[in-house]
Amino acid sequence: RDSSSGSLLNLAQGRFGPPGEPVRWLAALGADYGLIAVHRDSPLRSMADLLAAIRDDLRQVVFGAGGTVGSQDWVKAALIVRAAGLDHKAMRFVSFEGGGDALAALSGGHIKVFTGDAAEAMLALNDGAALRPLAVLSEHRLPGIWSRTPTAQEQGVDLVWRTVRGLYTGGQVSTEAVARWRAALA
């Protein structure tokens, strides 16, 4: 599964930004990919291990990430549970204010699996977070710090999660100013 088409469709239809706040899209800066990670001391070493743990006792596998039920990070967890052949409605998911809080909870052992994004996890890893990536949710391995992390697809889980990252401005900004920003960012 690939989330990028949904992100791009929303951009094309002008649906982006905080709900209820008029904003104007300026430019896409790049893509961020989903990441599945566990505590570095976890016995889980692969997606196969994670799927086996889910099948063995789903209630013991506590997922967590920034966002609420229905958010992108929650959907990643639900799709992993579905890949294990179980109903996502039985999973335990802890919502955090953001990825940083979720990664702190993972490091503290309060959740078992982080279903966030590579960019936020990279920052945490660089700061010494106690996490081990199991999979990146991209078509191909990512460069740099993630180059040795296999994709979910390499491990038999058909899950790709790309999020478009970009800039937008307030809805009250003039058309001329938006055009100047778009030209500068092109």
Regions found by a protein language model. Name each.
Residues R1-R165:
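Conserved hydrophobic/amphipathic secondary-structure segments
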Residues S46-D49, S174-L185:
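Short amphipathic alpha-helical coupling segments at ligand-binding clamshell hinges
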Residues L159-G171, E176-R180:
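Small-residue transmembrane helix packing/gating motifs
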